[in-house]
Amino acid sequence: MLTSKGQGFLHGGLCLWLCVFTPFFKGCVGCATEERLFHKLFSHYNQFIRPVENVSDPVTVHFEVAITQLANVDEVNQIMETNLWLRHIWNDYKLRWDPMEYDGIETLRVPADKIWKPDIVLYNNAVGDFQVEGKTKALLKYNGMITWTPPAIFKSSCPMDITFFPFDHQNCSLKFGSWTYDKAEIDLLIIGSKVDMNDFWENSEWEIIDASGYKHDIKYNCCEEIYTDITYSFYIRRLPMFYTINLIIPCLFISFLTVLVFYLPSDCGEKVTLCISVLLSLTVFLLVITETIPSTSLVVPLVGEYLLFTMIFVTLSIVVTVFVLNIHYRTPTTHTMPRWVKTVFLKLLPQVLLMRWPLDKTRGTGSDAVPRGLARRPAKGKLASHGEPRHLKECFHCHKSNELATSKRRLSHQPLQWVVENSEHSPEVEDVINSVQFIAENMKSHNETKEVEDDWKYVAMVVDRVFLWVFIIVCVFGTAGLFLQPLLGNTGKS
């Protein structure tokens, strides 16, 4: 016989054994019940037969799409890649049971390939499988309601209009429907009116503005039956910050650098160099961003139009700069300034542009800059004079001091020309007078030439100023006109 101490030890061990293994037995009983239920439901079940009591009755399938990720939008190939969860809900009368008979089991998770499923496919699929794989399990309730939510990655066809790239909006649709069953056999009903976006991960390039669903009953040319489909329209907008910072703003800077060419003085000799440098920088920039812009020949994107506009802008600036430099370096020996050029570019336009001559000088023929009284010497040794230069008087006072001293008062009232012609003087004095006359004529010719050259330079400056304002206006209004198109286009569509 066991002692009281031994009986207590045996009783404690029995309690510990019951506490440890009782849940295990309950689990085994539960597993056996679930296995018995599964065997009862699928022992004579045929997954290829529609779950209807009458063959004329349709299977009502409730359908909903939940998007988790907008993976990619390929503008070139016109493909939208999405990560979706497709929720199917229908009733199968052959998969019902009484929970009281199976230890209160109300739900059962069964492999999807064991049950009948509606063959819902994506009609406008571009790449990959049209139908989702049945590797996931379905949730089966005791009243026969089945909920099947398989995940799928679809690459759907989407006609895209990139006219306003990178400020474009796209409208891509996903069309789901039964591939073999018509409306008389499967009636699709949409759950809600929009795509479920509770688990959506934001995309760094695209924003989903709206995602609405619609049900359509369509009769195709191939068949007499009516087929039901559910179409979800995704209205997406491109986020333009990346393209604005890396594409548009550099182009704007290049355009305004082109405007500065016309503010650069022509005498510095670097106007064409600056134009060529801007053109080369734009060319290199275009080569870098070629991979960024969608390559399509259907339409010209907005950013492509702007790059083309900038290229034409820079090219025209080179042409205008060459023309301005040609005007700037003209001389009286090569070109004669027409009267209309003087009127327009020396009088009219400077007043309009609020320009004035850098030096306050009198406009004339240049004769005021030459000492009067000096002309070409006659052939007989007499001097022809048009004035009374003071240095000639001093010369005659030096060499004919005796004669002029006695008649100083009389000569002061007589013309210098008469004095020179009726006075006798030495050959040295004639050489000095001829030299002074030659220097004066050269000064006069140089001043006249310099004045004409200054006129041409001023005309070039006026032309530069005109094109400076023209290019500023074209640059501002051209840029505004191009980038206001998306706003006006979207307003018109709305």
Curated annotation (Swiss-Prot):
Underlying gene: CHRNA6
Name of the featured protein: Neuronal acetylcholine receptor subunit alpha-6
Extracellular side: 26-239
Primary localization class, coarse: membrane
Catalyzed reaction equations: Ca(2+)(in) = Ca(2+)(out); K(+)(in) = K(+)(out); Na(+)(in) = Na(+)(out)
Sequence ranges on the Cytoplasmic membrane side: 328-465
Modified residues (Phosphoserine): S401
Taxonomic source organism: Homo sapiens
Record's bilayer topology term: Multi-pass membrane protein
